[in-house]
């Protein structure tokens, strides 16, 4: 690639002139001629890579800096295109002031204006001007605002239309209209503009009052914003890309939904019309009853819906006095039904998107029966979870592909830049060699830098105080205070800011200068790493920080620096002042060149060097400037007035404050204050006592004062200039200011909302809580990356809200006050104004669309509503929101949750905690030493050797005290690193500036047991008093450490470094001095601090190996045997020997598989028994007595099992196993409850509670079922991360909860009238507040009640937020909030309308982000665990994986023998028909037609239609039966070898059966429903799956499902277990609650079956609010606590605490964790499946290979003749195909030939695979493995040893041709000689002696058709040499020279030449 500085400076930019155009025409002509010649020569197009436009020169991009400065006179002028790609296109480019590239067609615009026309040039200038686009953007935004108003005059529209027309005219004049490249209509965004303008004029011309549809197109103007802002175009590109990708998923989804809808249609049609009608109503009258006729129809209590019922035994039943009859209406305005395919499809789509599906579920089960729950389970798990998450998977992948493309683009730019830099380096080297000083070049007049004022640059140097010397020759680093202050602020020397998105890595020739790894979040480089790696950054002051840069000039290195670079912390020594003599001269005013010679000889060289260096410098300067947020004048002002350096006393005062605020304890105190302050805010509740309120107020004042002081101290200590450079400090400052404002305001004033700002202080915890920090960063990154996407989403919401308002506002019956009234009812969700319209669209995005759509369909046209709502649902919810989640997940992969943050202050906190721990250690050691001094004899002598191992406390082990390298403060670099432990290490806890790194080997446990810790502590304290012993041990410890160091070079600490933990004794004892130079050699370990193995410890671990032996473990732990010597018995002596034998016997019993099976069976039985203990148990005394008896039996068996295991395993092993503990606890619960029952204490409340814990019994099954255990293990692994996220969610939610308490506490109460059903609010005109409600309650019907879920305190606030976040029950909470007024006043309709926004904001941040973090965390965790347990593929390169996968697929295949054609001619004729592809296609078409006829069926269709459909059904059955018979006739016994045929056969049998049965059962139809047989017919649809073989994408999706099934089954099992346990709990706790909301006679906790129905429903979180509502009742008017129940208990109230815990835990476990595991598995497998499908060779390619092979090898011999190879290669499809002419390629493949000139299929397949994948070293070994595999499964190849290869054959062929030619010419010559001498007989004699029908003659006739089928093995000499690869290299004849024209010849001939 030609680099851009071939011609530097302004010469890059040339005006576009007529000569330029003529040149382009010449180029085009030359290009065409070359193309023609190529086509003629090759006969086909070149397959080489076509030239592509350069990425950084695309239109709309900014021109890179290294093209030089653009002269002012060329701005907006046509220029010759810089991109070589366009040299053959009639185009030119134009640059505006901001260097944005625009391209235009060089043809005549509108056939009137040439590129050189003045009018066109003016139009171009205007169109590229930045102000033009700004003006248009502002116009569009104003227009959008105007469209939301309804009261604006029509004339305003015309103004906008005129502006848009002007814009379009300018663009058309500048670009031309549509014919050529870069014209107006060639840009799809302009189509939008054009249509908007056209519609505006059409609307003005015709009166559009009636056709409001067209007016709504004005809304599309909002999309014009996208066409103006370039960044948005990219995201829209990604969106369109993902929509394209969704094609396969859409087809699969529609297909699955159609199948489910058909099943639903057959099962449930007409059922939802069944209602409870009053007894005595005439059935004919019932047919005409509409749902409005309430006097006849029973209404479900608490609702306005009629009660549905069914006639089945398990369907819903009617109450007394009512009978179940069919009515004409379906529920929900007649829209919820399965009566026709369309309605069934809508219902299924609703089920898939899970919008209020619990309502459909309850209605269907009530009308049809509980058994149909199976249908819903299938649809929810397959349809909803699988298909919806496939959409997520596809969108995620599309996004990843898009971002990969972006990364590739960046890398391409980087590569280009790299090359540019190399050129620069070469230039510099050349100049340096010539002795030219490029430093002086900087002042050259031509340089872009010359234009910069030197004064302008000076302040920048000041601003980078940390980077070098200032004007007054005083290095700022020399001042230790400044140094520490800057280091604290992250501005330390040795650091340099870098932008996050920096794409360039700079490399100097002699040294790597790519960015170091240590970039912190805020883009700060860690100085230590920079200096340690010796890296420098190209740029201002680059060399000042680390080691000196090495110039390409010869120079002596600075000898004193090497050590600093490598061994020590990267802290500059402050030696480098402005007058530093050594090293190259570094210009302190910020120049970037490293060359230091001082003369310029030749002007040309000077100019050349100047131009290159200056351009590069300007590029680097551009990077540098992009990081400067303020103009230089402001910086100088800030430095002058915001750095407060006064008298020495002031500095002393500052120093003292600095010490105070940077002390780790100060950090700890502030953190604690934040926590306490948060607790104070969370304690607010309603109602509060005055004293409590006063306490909270006082607390608030105290905290505000405290935080104000903290801020003031920090500002003084750091100076405002540095203080405000940290984001956290700005954040603090804002919060403190707001707190002060709030304090100054009155409590109830308008500023009380400011209190909520104080809550943001919680986020300060992120500084000391890495997980919170990471998650905030993830959300931050996502919001950042999502900036554009959020904007797109906003535009989508805006457009749809406007469309809705424009189309539907009139239909909603809007009043002047903006309230919508329909049928006398006020509507909350309507489209009368923009705000309500926005809310409706937002609600659809939340996934709730169906209820609004019903209302819309009632008030307006059904079609408009369906289209509008479904479009928003599919586009907004499924695509855009999934793209959001994709971005979130993407952020996860970038940020690992477990990674600790490299933030100095985080470590301050850890240091403070470490100090406290040290104090704790010392105290514990003092106590331990006191004890040990009295009990010294107890310690065994051998253990003293452990004493010197310094123990790590838990927090240290966790964090390894890796404090941030606050590098500037260690001044004494010259001291030996480990010379004095007393000096260096004694201070490591207190000195925050020491870098301590204690890495731990991966395999080690991070935490020591506390016992051991204490043990070691007491041992070391004992040794304090025994210096002699210590002295003896020291050499050994020393040895150990040396051993360690030798083993693992490069750490920074040895065990010595932890000296402070060993107390004064370590410090008192001088350790051997370590010389400074040896630092790196002696004390380092690369990632390991494994101590020397102690023999004692090794011996201790040996008993753990006993698991593998057939003998039991020790019974007790060492601790027990040490303290109780009696436990330590000799098992070889009597009587203990007998005991040992008993133990061995027990061990064998317990380990026996039968024992385990028996226990599993017992667990299942006992769990099953629990299911019978329902609410009706008292009514079944016999069942009750059986259950009591079995309970005792099970308890006895489990106790016996436990005792057996104790004896067999011993206490030690039993109680160190978590699963055994679980068993132990559950057995104890059973035992306790059994004993209580025997002692007749079973009615005691605590025993009752304990009995409910028996529900945990099924948990014991967990450890026994492998599948579930795997899932549980994975979950347990994820628990830390899940808990982290849960905590962070709680913190996020805490803020919203406290805000909710501030806004709504006490305001949700209202006065209700209990006479209505459901209870209705009393009108506020009658009752205005609480006291009025009580006063008017003379009738006893008015009650002042609180909404059950409210914001009266933070805990209830959490519950309310959980309901909002899961979108269940959130409507009631929102309505209460929106209607709320003052405390204790009656709510008014939409009194507080904008409170909706509180919920909108919470849903976006609290609901959307935090709940999706769960998916992210779980997926992330699974990936981590996979890596830990990773298989071989982790250690394989991508190339190897491709080969591995290709070969894996190869091995499982072999050539199939095709079904032989029958000899009978009739059978043969049928065989030919049924094996044709056309026959299959016809059958498929018939299957589709059959499916369509099934769709036509409806409920209550006419007699005639039923008959016709019956006939059509019979016709299809006959056709399919005919197909089946024909195939069986033709294929004979082979028919059943194909799975699809067997499937067809079963379907046909079932279809015939259903026809016969339905005929027989016509008379019995009333007693027996033929639904079952209807469904059987649907099995035929399954045959469509055969079609799917053709659709690769869909097959990938199904393949992903098949791969997921095993994992999904395990997850399903776990989910079932959780449901089972919870349903048992539910039966025990909530059996008697009142029927209300979600609980009724069918859905309740009275029986096990009903509990499971409820729990399945809330697995997706659907309707859990309804189930919780009655449980929250505590008394009248909702329930009666004294009502007697059937089982002897009293009351039908719930227990709110138990209910809330029950439902929230279930939702977290099932909905957030288990269901997200399901999602994680699907995403994972989808990725795998897609990878497989995108591999160069897939399963199908090999299938296709073998299918084609069958045609060429009908006998399945696995060989084909070489002559057939060319045709075979051409017949293949896909990547393996080698199209004709292919002879040349095939010969070059060097395939082995066996006798008979045949080639084995595996050899061909290998060669073709190699042809696709290219060369690879792994191929040979894989090939060997493959051949072994193939031999094992297939016919032996051994008898066919290869005797030649195709290449050898070709060589011999050529040799033969040469010999033949020579022979012929010899013969000709001879015959002429003979004819002359007339010796003809002699010639014949000679002829006879020549070789006759041999190889040569065969070669001469090789062009003739084959005669013989069998070729003899003598055709080739059977030498094995010919087989060996690589022989071709030794061959004398080079075949390629003679092959050139052979391809053409071969192509002309029908057959390829081959040996016979």
Curated annotation (Swiss-Prot):
Catalytic activity: Na(+)(in) = Na(+)(out)
PTM summary: Ubiquitinated by NEDD4L; which promotes its endocytosis.
Cellular component aspect of the GO annotation: axon; C-fiber; clathrin complex; glutamatergic synapse; plasma membrane; presynaptic membrane; voltage-gated sodium channel complex
Induction note: Down-regulated after axotomy in dorsal root ganglia.
One Pfam family this sequence matches: Ion_trans
UniProt main location, coarse: membrane
GO MF term list: transmembrane transporter binding; voltage-gated monoatomic ion channel activity involved in regulation of presynaptic membrane potential; voltage-gated sodium channel activity; voltage-gated sodium channel activity involved in cardiac muscle cell action potential
UniProt II repeat ranges: 646-910
Subcellular location: Cell membrane
III repeat placement: 1141-1450
Membrane topology according to the record: Multi-pass membrane protein
Compositionally biased spans, kind Basic and acidic residues: 42-54
GO annotation (BP), single: bundle of His cell action potential
Tissue expression from the record: Expressed in dorsal root ganglia, trigeminal ganglia, nodose ganglia and sciatic nerve.
UniProt feature, compositional bias: Polar residues: 441-453, 475-484, 1931-1940
I repeats: 116-404
Modified residues (Phosphoserine): 440, 443, 466, 478, 611, 614, 1452
Disulfide bonds: 276-318, 856-865
Extracellular side: 150-154, 207-212, 273-340, 366-372, 684-694, 747-752, 810-833, 855-863, 1173-1185, 1240-1243, 1313-1354, 1377-1392, 1497-1507, 1562-1573, 1634-1647, 1671-1698
Entry annotated with the keyword Lyase: no
Main function: Tetrodotoxin-resistant channel that mediates the voltage-dependent sodium ion permeability of excitable membranes. Assuming opened or closed conformations in response to the voltage difference across the membrane, the protein forms a sodium-selective channel through which sodium ions may pass in accordance with their electrochemical gradient. Plays a role in neuropathic pain mechanisms.
Quaternary structure annotation from Swiss-Prot or TrEMBL: The channel consists of an ion conducting pore forming alpha-subunit regulated by one or more associated auxiliary subunits SCN1B, SCN2B and SCN3B; electrophysiological properties may vary depending on the type of the associated beta subunits. Found in a number of complexes with PRX, DYNLT1 and PDZD2. Interacts with proteins such as FSTL1, PRX, DYNLT1, PDZD2, S100A10 and many others. Interacts with NEDD4 and NEDD4L.
Listed name of the protein: Sodium channel protein type 10 subunit alpha
Species per Swiss-Prot/TrEMBL record: Rattus norvegicus
């Amino acid at each position: 690639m030609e680099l851009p500085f071939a011609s530097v400076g302004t010469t890059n930019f040339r005006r576009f002139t007529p000569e330029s155009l003529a040149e382009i025409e010449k180029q085009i002509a030359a290009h065409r001629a070359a193309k023609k010649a190529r086509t003629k020569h090759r006969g086909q197009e070149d397959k080489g890579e076509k030239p592509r436009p350069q990425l950084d020169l695309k239109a709309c991009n900014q021109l890179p800096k290294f093209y030089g400065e653009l002269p002012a006179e060329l701005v907006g002028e046509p220029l010759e295109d810089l991109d070589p790609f366009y040299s053959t296109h009639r185009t030119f480019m134009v640059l505006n002031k901001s260097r944005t590239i625009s391209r235009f067609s060089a043809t005549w615009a509108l056939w009137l204006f040439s590129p050189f026309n003045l009018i066109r040039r003016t139009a171009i200038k205007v169109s590229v001007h930045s102000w033009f686009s700004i003006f248009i953007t502002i116009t569009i935004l104003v227009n959008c605002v105007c469209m939301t108003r309804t009261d604006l005059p029509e004339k305003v529209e015309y103004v906008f239309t005129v502006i848009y027309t002007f814009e379009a005219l300018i663009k058309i004049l500048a670009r031309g209209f549509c014919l050529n490249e870069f014209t107006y209509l060639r840009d799809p965004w302009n189509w939008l503009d054009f249509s908007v303008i056209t519609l505006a004029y059409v609307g003005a011309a015709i009166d559009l009052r009636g056709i409001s549809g067209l007016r709504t197109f004005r809304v599309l103007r909002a999309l014009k914003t996208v066409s103006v802002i370039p960044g948005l175009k990219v995201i829209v590109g990604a969106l369109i890309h993902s929509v394209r990708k969704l094609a396969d998923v859409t087809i699969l989804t529609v297909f699955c939904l159609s199948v489910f809808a058909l099943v639903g249609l057959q099962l449930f049609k007409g059922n939802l019309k069944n209602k409870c009608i009053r007894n005595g109503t005439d059935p004919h009258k019932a047919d005409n009853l509409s749902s409005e006729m309430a006097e006849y129809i029973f209404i479900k209590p608490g609702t306005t819906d009629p009660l549905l019922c069914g006639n089945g035994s398990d369907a819903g039943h009617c109450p007394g006095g009512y009978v179940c009859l069919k009515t004409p209406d379906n529920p929900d305005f007649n829209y919820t039904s399965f009566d026709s395919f369309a309605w069934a499809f809508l219902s299924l789509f609703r089920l898939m998107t899970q919008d209020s599906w619990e309502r459909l579920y309850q209605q269907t089960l009530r009308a049809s029966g509980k058994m149909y729950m199976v249908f819903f389970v299938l649809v929810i798990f397959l349809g909803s979870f699988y298909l919806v998450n496939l959409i997520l998977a596809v969108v995620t992948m599309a996004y990843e592909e898009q971002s990969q493309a972006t990364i590739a683009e960046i890398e391409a730019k980087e590569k280009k830049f790299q090359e540019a830099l190399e050129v620069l380096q070469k230039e510099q080297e050349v100049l340096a060699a010539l002795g030219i000083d490029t430093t002086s070049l900087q002042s050259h007049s031509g340089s872009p830098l010359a234009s910069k004022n030197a004064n302008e640059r000076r302040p920048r140097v000041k601003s980078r105080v940390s980077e070098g010397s200032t004007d007054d020759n005083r290095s700022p680093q020399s001042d230790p205070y400044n140094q520490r202050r800057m280091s604290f602020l992250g501005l330390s020397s040795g650091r340099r800011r870098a932008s996050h998105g920096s794409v360039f890595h700079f490399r100097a020739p002699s040294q790597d200068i790519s960015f170091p790894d240590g970039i912190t979040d805020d883009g700060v480089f860690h100085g230590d790493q920079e200096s340690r790696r010796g890296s420098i950054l190209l740029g201002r002051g680059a060399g000042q920080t680390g080691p000196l840069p090495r110039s390409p000039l010869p120079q002596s290195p600075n000898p004193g620096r090497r050590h600093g670079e490598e061994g020590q912390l990267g802290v500059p020594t402050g030696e480098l002042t402005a007058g530093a003599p050594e090293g190259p001269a570094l210009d302190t005013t910020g120049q970037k060149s490293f060359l230091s010679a001082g003369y310029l000889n030749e002007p040309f060289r000077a100019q050349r060097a100047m131009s290159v260096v200056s351009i590069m410098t300007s590029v680097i300067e551009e990077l540098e400037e992009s990081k400067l947020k303020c103009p230089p004048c402001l910086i100088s002002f800030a430095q002058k007035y915001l750095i407060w350096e006064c008298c020495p006393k002031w500095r002393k005062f500052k120093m003292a404050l600095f010490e105070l605020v940077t002390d780790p304890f100060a950090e700890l105190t502030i953190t604690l204050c934040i926590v306490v302050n948060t607790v104070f805010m969370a304690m607010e509740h309603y109602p509060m006592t005055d004293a409590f309120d006063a306490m909270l107020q006082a607390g608030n004042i105290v905290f505000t004062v405290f935080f104000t002081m903290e801020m003031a101290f920090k500002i003084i200590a750091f100076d405002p200039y540095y203080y405000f450079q940290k984001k956290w400090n700005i954040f603090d400052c804002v919060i403190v200011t707001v707190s002060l404002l709030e304090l100054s305001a009155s409590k109830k004033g308008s500023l009380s909302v400011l209190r909520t700002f104080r809550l943001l202080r919680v986020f300060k915890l992120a500084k000391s809580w890495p997980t919170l920090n990471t998650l905030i960063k993830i959300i931050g990154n996502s919001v950042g990356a999502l900036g554009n996407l959020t904007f797109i989403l906003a535009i989508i919401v805006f457009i749809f809200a406007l469309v809705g308002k424009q189309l539907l506002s009139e239909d909603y019956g809007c009043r002047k006050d903006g309230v919508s009234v329909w049928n006398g009812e006020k509507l909350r969700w309507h489209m009368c104004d923009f705000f309500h319209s926005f809310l409706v669209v937002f609600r659809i995005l939340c996934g709730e669309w169906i209820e609004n759509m019903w209302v819309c369909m009632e008030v307006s046209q059904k079609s408009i509503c369906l289209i509008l709502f479904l479009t928003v649902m599919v586009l907004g919810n499924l695509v855009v929101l999934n793209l959001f989640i994709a971005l979130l997940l993407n952020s996860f992969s970038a940020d690992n949750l477990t990674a600790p943050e490299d933030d100095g202050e985080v470590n301050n906190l850890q240091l403070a905690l470490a100090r406290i721990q040290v104090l704790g250690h010392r105290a514990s050691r003092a106590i331990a030493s006191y004890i040990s001094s009295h009990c010294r004899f107890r310690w065994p002598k051998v253990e003293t050797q452990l004493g010197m191992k310094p123990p790590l406390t838990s927090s240290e082990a966790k964090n390894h005290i890796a404090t941030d390298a606050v590098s500037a403060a260690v001044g004494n670099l010259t001291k030996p690193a480990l010379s004095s432990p007393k000096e260096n290490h004694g201070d490591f806890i207190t000195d925050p500036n020491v870098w301590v790194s204690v890495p731990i080997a991966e395999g080690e446990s991070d935490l020591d047991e506390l016992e051991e810790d204490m043990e070691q502590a007491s041992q070391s304290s004992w040794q304090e008093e025994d210096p002699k012993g210590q002295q003896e041990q020291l050499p050994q410890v020393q040895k150990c450490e040396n051993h360690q160091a030798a083993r693992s070079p490069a750490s920074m600490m040895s065990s010595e470094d932890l000296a402070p933990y060993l107390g004064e004794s370590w410090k008192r004892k001088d350790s051997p001095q370590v010389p400074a130079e040896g630092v790196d050699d002696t004390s380092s370990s690369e990632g390991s601090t494994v101590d020397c193995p102690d023999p004692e410890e090794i011996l201790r671990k040996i008993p753990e190996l006993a698991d593998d032996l057939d003998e039991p473990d020790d019974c007790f732990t060492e601790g027990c045997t040490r303290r109780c010597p009696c436990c330590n018995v000799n098992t070889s002596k009597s009587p203990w020997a007998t005991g040992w034998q008993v133990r061995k016997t027990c061990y064998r019993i317990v380990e026996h598989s039968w024992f385990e099976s028996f226990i599993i069976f017992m667990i299942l039985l006992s769990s099953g028994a629990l299911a019978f203990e329902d609410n009706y148990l008292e009514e079944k005394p016999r069942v009750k007595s059986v259950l009591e008896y079995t309970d005792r039996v099970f308890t006895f068996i489990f106790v016996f099992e436990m005792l057996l295991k104790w004896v067999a395993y011993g206490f030690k092993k039993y109680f160190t196993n978590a699963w055994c503990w679980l068993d132990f606890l559950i057995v104890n619960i059973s035992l306790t409850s059994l004993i209580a029952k025997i002692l007749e204490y079973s009615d005691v409340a605590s025993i009752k509670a304990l009995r409910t814990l028996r529900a945990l019994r099924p948990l014991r099954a967990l450890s026994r079922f492998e599948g579930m255990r795997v899932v549980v293990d994975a979950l347990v692994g994820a628990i830390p991360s899940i808990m982290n996220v849960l905590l962070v969610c709680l913190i996020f939610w805490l803020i919203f909860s406290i805000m909710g308490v501030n806004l709504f506490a006490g305001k949700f109460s209202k006065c209700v009238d209990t006479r209505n059903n459901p209870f209705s609010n009393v009108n506020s005109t009658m009752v205005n507040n609480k006291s009025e409600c009580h006063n008017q309650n003379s009738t006893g019907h008015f009650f002042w009640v609180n909404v059950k879920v409210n914001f009266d305190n933070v805990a209830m606030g959490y519950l309310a937020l959980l309901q909002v976040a899961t979108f269940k029950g959130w409507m009631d909470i929102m309505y209460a909030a929106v209607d709320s007024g003052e405390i204790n006043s009656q709510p008014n309709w939409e009194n507080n309308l904008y409170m909706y926004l509180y919920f909108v904001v919470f849903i976006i941040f609290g609901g959307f982000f935090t709940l999706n973090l769960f998916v992210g965390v779980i997926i992330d965790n699974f990936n981590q665990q996979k890596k830990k347990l990773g298989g071989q593929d982790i250690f394989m390169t991508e190339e190897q994986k491709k080969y591995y996968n290709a070969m894996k697929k190869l091995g499982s295949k072999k050539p199939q023998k095709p079904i032989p054609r029958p000899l009978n001619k009739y059978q043969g004729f049928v065989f030919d028909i049924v094996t044709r592809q056309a026959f299959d296609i016809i059958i498929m078409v018939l299957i589709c037609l059959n499916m369509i006829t099934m769709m036509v069926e409806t409920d209550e269709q006419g007699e005639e239609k039923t008959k016709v459909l019956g006939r059509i059904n019979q016709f299809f059955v006959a056709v399919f039966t005919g197909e089946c018979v024909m195939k069986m006739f033709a294929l004979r016994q082979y028919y059943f070898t194909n799975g699809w045929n067997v499937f067809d056969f079963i379907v046909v049998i079932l279809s015939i059966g259903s026809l016969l049965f339905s005929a027989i059962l016509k008379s019995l139809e009333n007693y027996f429903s033929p639904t079952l047989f209807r469904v059987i017919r649907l099995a035929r649809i399954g045959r469509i799956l055969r079609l799917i073989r053709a659709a690769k994408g869909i097959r990938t999706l199904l393949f992903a499902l098949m791969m997921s099934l095993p994992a999904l089954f395990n997850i399903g099992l776990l989910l079932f277990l959780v449901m089972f346990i919870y349903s048992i709990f539910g039966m025990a706790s909530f059996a008697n609650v009142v029927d209300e909301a979600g609980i009724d006679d069918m859905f309740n906790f009275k029986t096990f079956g009903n509990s499971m129905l409820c729990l399945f429903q809330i697995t997706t979180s659907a309707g859990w609010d309804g189930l919780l509502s009655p449980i929250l009742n505590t008394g009248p008017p909702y329930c009666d606590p004294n009502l007697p129940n059937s089982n002897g208990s009293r009351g039908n109230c719930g227990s709110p605490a138990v209910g809330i815990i029950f439902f929230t835990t279930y939702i977290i476990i099932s909905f957030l964790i288990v269901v997200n595991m399901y999602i994680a598995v699907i995403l994972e497998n989808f990725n795998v499946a897609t990878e497989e499908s995108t591999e160069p060779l897939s399963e199908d390619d090999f299938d296709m290979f073998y299918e084609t092979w069958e045609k060429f090898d009908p006998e399945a011999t696995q060989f084909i003749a070489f002559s057939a190879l060319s045709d075979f290669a051409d017949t293949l499809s896909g990547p393996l195909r080698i199209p004709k002419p292919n002879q040349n390629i095939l010969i070059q493949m060097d395939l082995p030939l066996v006798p008979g000139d045949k080639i084995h299929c595996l050899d061909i397949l290998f060669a073709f695979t190699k042809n696709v994948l290219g060369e690879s070293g792994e191929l040979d070994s894989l090939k060997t493995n493959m051949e072994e595999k193939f031999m094992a499964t297939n016919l032996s190849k051994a008898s066919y040893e290869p005797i030649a290869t195709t290449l050898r054959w070709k060589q011999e062929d050529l040799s033969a041709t040469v010999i033949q030619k020579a022979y012929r010419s010899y013969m000709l010559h001879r015959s002429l000689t003979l004819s002359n001498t007339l010796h003809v007989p002699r010639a014949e004699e000679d002829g006879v002696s020549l070789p006759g029908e041999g190889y040569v003659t065969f070669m001469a006739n090789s062009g003739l058709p084959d005669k013989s089928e069998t070729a003899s093995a003598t055709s080739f000499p059977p030498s094995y040499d010919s087989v060996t690869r690589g022989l071709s290299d030794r061959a004398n004849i080079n075949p390629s020279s003679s092959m050139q024209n052979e391809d053409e010849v071969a192509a002309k001939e029908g057959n390829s030449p081959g040996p016979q």
